[in-house]
């Protein structure tokens, strides 16, 4: 089963998206956007940048949990991962974004 982006609207009328792997697990989440068009642009940016290893920033949270950010060419964060148990799990998450994002469908759940 292929990955997909879910475009959603929050209770406070902001827009955001999540990238789900084929198994339904969320592997990347966006920030909140004021406009739907901006969130759609964010999805396109993830698709464009997902295959470039240099766009992934590996990090460790204060509690020691590894995670990653996907950045656009201008350095802006366009998506963040969940917190992982290990660096190996984080690296698998990055591989999953690389594999799923470029051809993922977009499911608009904002209506």
Language-model region placement:
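Charged, low-complexity amphipathic helices and coil/IDR segments
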Residues: 1-3, 103
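Glycine-rich beta-strand-turn "strand-cap" elements at beta-sheet edges
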Residues: 98-111
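A structural feature that tracks compact, well-ordered secondary-structure segments
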Residues: 6-8, 14-22, 27-33, 42-46, ...
């Amino acid at each position: 089963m292929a990955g997909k982006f879910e475009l959603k609207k929050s209770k406070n009328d902001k827009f955001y998206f999540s990238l789900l792997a084929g198994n339904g697990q969320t592997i990347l989440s966006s920030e909140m956007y004021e406009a739907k068009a901006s969130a759609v642009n964010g999805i396109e940016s993830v698709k464009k940048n997902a295959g470039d290893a240099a766009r992934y920033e590996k990090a460790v949270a204060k509690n020691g949990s590894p995670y990653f950010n996907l950045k656009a060419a201008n350095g802006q964060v366009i998506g963040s991962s969940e917190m992982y148990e290990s660096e190996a799990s984080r690296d698998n998450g990055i591989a999953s974004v690389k594999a799923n994002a470029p051809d993922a469908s977009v499911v608009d759940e904002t209506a």
